[in-house]
Amino acid sequence: MSILVRFPASNVSKQQYDTVRDNLTGAGDWPPDGCELHVAFGPDDDIRVSEVWQTADKFRSFGDKLRPQLEQAGIQLAGEPEVFDDVHVVETL
C-alpha cells in the first residue's frame, strides 16, 4: 500500500526547489525510484511538496540522498515529514 508524505518546510523559494531538483537530476537520483507522484505547489517564495510513495522503505532510501541537497540549498525542515499510511491512489488520466 502506498504512503503519502508531506514535507514541513516553509519559505522555500522556487529557486531553492529548482536547485535541489536539478542537483538530484544531475546525480541520477531524479525522479526517485518508488515515487509514484510528486506535487510541488504554492507561490514562488513558499513552495510546498507532497509525494506518494510505493513504500516507506523507498522513501527513506531517497531521504538519504535528499537531505544533503536540502542542506546545500539552505532549506531547513521544521521537523520530520508527515507520513500517512495506507493511501489509495486512483489514476484517472
Question: What do the predicted segments below correspond to?
Answer:
Residues M1-S50, Q54-P68, I75-L93:
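Short S/T/G/P-rich N-terminal loop/turn motif that feeds into the first structured element of a domain
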